C-alpha cells in the first residue's frame, strides 16, 4: 500500500503456490518497487492512471532485465488506485482488489472480476479440500499452473506483471468528488468479509472505518477467519489472505 495526500494505491501480489517464477527477486520485491514507481509516475495530476501504470510497469521491468519476464509465472500483482484530481475522483482497478465509494447513503464497489470466470472447474476442485492438506496444496498448484497460461491474454484476465500493455486493460473512470462522502481502497483479503464471508455489509465496513479505522477492520477479518481455519465453511486458497486497506476522507 502507498499513499500521498491525493493518491491511494493498494497492490496485492499474486501467490506463486510454491512454483517457479523465472525471477530471482520474488513477489514482495516486485510489489514494493511497483508501488514506488507508480507513485512517481502519477506525481503529475494530469497523467492518466492507465498511462501512469504502463510507465511504472516499464520502469520496474527495467530494474530486473536478467529475469525471465516472459515466464507466465513472473511476479505479478493486482492494482487499485484512487486519486483526487481537482474536483473529481479518478479510479483504476486491474484484477480483484476493489475500491468502494460511499455515495449518498449507498455504496459502489469498483472491481475487476475477470479472474473469477477463468477455469471454474479447477477452482471448484481446490475448494473441495480443506486448507493445509496435501490435496489442497496439489490442487492449488495445478490450478495456478493452468491459470498462469491465461494470465494477461485475451481469453483470460489481466494483472500487473512484466508487460506494460496490461495497463490498457485496466478498468478506469471518474466520479465527481461532491458525490462521494469517503472511500476505501483495499485488497480482496479485506473485501471478502462482505463478498465471500458475508458477515458484514459495506455499511458495517464503513462504520468501522469511520469510528475505529483500518486496523480494527482488518482484525474483524482475522477474527472471522479464525472461526474457520481450514476453510470448511468458506472454501478458499489459504486460511487468511493478505489484508490491506486505505481509508480516504477529504
Positions of predicted regions on the chain:
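PP2C/PPM-type serine/threonine phosphatase catalytic domain
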Residues: 1-250
Amino acid at each position: 500500500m502507498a499513499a500521498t495526500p491525493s493518491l491511494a494505491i493498494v497492490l496485492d501480489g499474486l501467490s506463486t503456490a510454491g512454483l517457479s517464477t523465472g525471477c530471482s527477486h520474488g513477489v514482495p520485491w516486485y510489489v514494493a518497487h511497483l508501488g514506488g514507481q507508480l507513485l512517481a509516475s502519477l506525481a503529475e495530476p494530469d497523467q492518466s492512471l492507465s498511462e501512469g501504470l504502463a510507465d511504472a510497469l516499464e520502469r520496474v521491468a527495467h530494474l530486473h532485465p536478467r529475469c525471465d519476464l516472459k515466464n507466465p509465472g513472473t511476479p505479478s500483482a493486482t492494482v487499485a488506485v484512487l486519486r483526487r484530481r481537482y474536483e473529481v475522483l479518478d479510479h483504476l482497478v486491474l484484477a480483484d482488489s476493489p475500491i468502494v465509494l460511499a455515495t449518498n447513503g449507498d455504496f459502489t464497489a469498483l472491481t475487476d472480476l475477470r479472474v473469477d470466470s477463468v477455469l471454474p472447474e479447477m477452482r471448484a476442485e481446490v475448494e473441495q479440500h480443506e486448507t493445509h492438506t496435501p490435496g489442497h496444496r496439489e490442487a492449488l498448484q495445478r490450478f495456478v499452473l493452468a491459470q498462469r497460461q491465461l494470465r494477461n491474454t485475451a481469453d483470460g484476465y489481466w494483472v500487473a506483471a512484466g508487460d506494460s500493455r496490461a495497463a490498457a486493460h485496466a478498468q478506469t473512470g471518474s466520479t465527481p468528488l461532491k458525490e462521494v462522502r469517503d472511500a476505501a481502497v483495499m485488497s480482496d483479503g479485506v473485501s471478502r468479509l462482505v463478498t465471500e464471508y458475508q458477515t458484514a455489509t459495506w455499511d458495517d465496513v464503513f462504520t468501522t472505518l469511520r469510528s475505529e479505522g483500518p486496523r480494527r477492520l482488518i482484525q474483524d477479518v482475522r477474527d472471522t477467519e479464525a472461526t474457520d481455519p481450514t476453510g470448511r465453511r468458506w472454501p478458499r486458497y489459504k486460511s487468511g489472505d493478505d489484508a490491506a486497506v486505505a481509508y480516504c476522507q477529504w
